[in-house]
Amino acid sequence: RNSQHDYDYIIIGSGFGGSVAALRLAEKGYRVLVLEKGKWFSEKDYPKRNWNLKRWLWMPLLRFFGFFKISFFRHVTILSGVGVGGGSLVYANTLPLPKKEFFTAKSWAHLADWEKELTGHYQTARQMLGTVPNPELQTGDVALQKLAKNLGKENEFEPTQVAVFFGEPDKTVPDPYFGGKGPDRAGCNFCGGCMTGCRIGAKNTL
């Protein structure tokens, strides 16, 4: 028997679900194997724009081996990531906290006090992903702010909470989140390429 391939847990997928489960199990001392059909993507692997379909989309039948997968079903279309990091590669790194109405929705409010149950986990996720307010309001933000004002909701407008490192633009520095044990990060330059893959290393993924 080859103990090199003996694992306590095998996890399929390395996105928000798989990578977190793998981390917590490994922290408890279990031998964990994570299987991911996509590859490791570095900053240089991402396309400059989404018109470069072969480097952006995952469509193996067309020989497109990017990281952005679109699955069409009868009543729903699912966007997902294919690569180490899974969905964290393709989400727009926005991490808003749900409003109170979300936790008290009739469809599930009777099951538990969800705000109490989940608040701590939201905080952990935001800390692990380095969530901060976007320091710059772009055209879309300003439009939303004006709309909120017109609707009498200006006090509810706030900068988007994002998992991005806002250091000096384009300057790479040692990991600022986990005492130097994580990957180097580079300051965001506001290029807007969050969903086509961050080419400078400012977006925090898994």
Which residue ranges define each predicted feature?
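N-terminal glycine-rich phosphate/pyrophosphate-binding loop and immediately adjacent elements
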Residues: 1-106, 110-116
